Amino acid sequence: MDNPVTNAAVSTVADAATNAGTVFNGLDWFVIALFGLGMIATVWYSMRKKNESGKDYFLSGRDANWLQIGSSIYSSNIGSEHLVGLAGAGFVTGMAMAHWEMHGWLILVLGWAFVPLYDRMKIFTMPEFLELRFSRGSRNVLSLLTMASLVLTKIAATIYAGDVVIRTLLNVDSVNLLGHNVDIFWVIALGLAFTTGLYTIFGGMRVIMYTAVLQAPVLIFGSVCILYMGLHVLGHGSLADGWKATLSAAGKNVHLVRSIHDPDWPWLAILPGSAIIGFWYWCTDQYIVQRVLAGKNQQESRRGTILAAFFKLTPVFIFLVPGMVAFALTQTPGSGFTTGGDAAYTSLVAQGDAAYTSLVAQILPHGLRGMVACGMIVALMASLGSKFNASATLFTMDFYREWHPTASGRTEVIVGRIATAAIVFIGICWVLVIKSLHMPLYEYLQNVQGYLSPAIAVLFALGVFWKRATAPAALWAFVVGMLGGFGRLAADLIIARPINTLKGITDGNLSMLNYLVKGSVNVAAEKTQQIKDQIQEATSQMASALPLVKDQLAIKIQCLQQILGGTGITPDQYNEKKTIVEAALPALKTQLHEQWGLIFSFQQNIHWLYYCEGLLVVTAALMIIISLLTRAPDPKTVKYTYYGATPEEKAATRASWNAMDVVLSLIVVAVIVLFYIKFW
């Protein structure tokens, strides 16, 4: 029997896919306006208290409660990697990326093991811990690296995600400003950065905390609606049938743990590797831990982490699974669902990037579309504002206060606002730079945190839990770990980018080549020029990065350039030229291996998560050996370890938790274990 609700939903999918004007209607815009007024009221309310000192501006006066802390951790975490990346990962690889989302137990480690220490120290920044435990030098290095990572990768990534989200929701590529067609990217980038920067500059951490309480429930509720409607449509009115269809479409991708021989997600790489990065992110990264430092006391901070751990259980179900549902819908004949163009001529990754917002635009009824769109946009703003504030905190507290130790609290606030404004400006300028670069370069820059996290994780783990760790050992281990991370990053940039650029041109799933076989001469001519530009860029990279093999590569590159024959090609010509290119690539890789040897082997054959694990082992071993060979640390620094609390401090920590806190924490762990058992 036909289900009228399902029929209406399917009709909505088909209509939205063919008619851009139906994405939003008056009800959606009313909801968006209403939510906007709510945000303005929340910002105004949070700014009633004046920021009189650095503690007020950067840590919300250290009076945040558990609801604000937990909501802020969650809202700050839900950024580009979730709204675009996680749903896209679900679309392309199924459950493979769920490991990172099942790290609620690491948030509990933050609350139970690190909160007592951080609370005793009353620090403003994570690098400040390194100075008190080890040396000023280690503080400076970590602070600079963290600021660079925030500004050059995370801020820009959030702005890029905003472009994908808003562009898909509005179905607009350009707008007319003063008689000129302007790419919508610039309107979105400048609008997000300016609006978020404005309230962050004047409100500081307090406004971020207050708005998070409004943002988190709206985003979760709206995302649950997306999951419900997606399964409902896919199952023709039955959620159970929709879930079965999702699992069926995913096939082997439904499993969390893949074979050790899997080229992308071998279990021995992803299980320990994701935990290493997770420990760094949840327990030591300024961007996240700053919310805990703002807590009123240990009890509020710990309970905030417990709430955040519960929240962290949701992204798999409200972001990753909807991506899997979107994939199943694209495989269902007659569904009318599309993720950014003709699936036959659009890469799977590009379709995945638009999966979540396509569900919003095509599955949800009007009204809910507007509400979920608000939740998505303010989640990006919350993530962006947190990054602005964290960067300004690092500059002001780790550098300015060191240069001007007698500066008043009011001066710290002024400097913090100026620093925030400067970071907003630098972030916009950097977006202008990366917009002109080939995307693979930016994607490799995103790996910075993966390659640098092992050294930071070692410093904090041994610094907190091992009394014998010394300052010289920490500095040497940090330097070696950083060099190892940057070395792998350099190998990626020097070797992989040119190879992958050229190889990507031959990928039959990528839209560039597939457009050539669509039969449109005009489109083919345009795409041919884009491919020509790509190959010329890759050729230039090869020549500059590999001067020793320039002559040897000339023949291979010439073969690759044969693909540029004419303004349009037939499918047979396409296949012929594709065969030529694919035949040239093995010889190209062989030549590179002969010239670059070990570096090329490392880049090509060692999974980046294996490299992360190996770097952790090397860094930890080095720090332990040097610590044992150098003078024992000053007893004054040992008090900044997990075991350095006085009897009074231990009693205060014990009084800050009760049986309910333990039970709730165990529930989080139990859910994670059951999830792994179910999807093993």
How does the language model describe each region?
Residues 2-680:
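Membrane-embedded helix-loop-helix hairpins and adjacent transmembrane boundary segments
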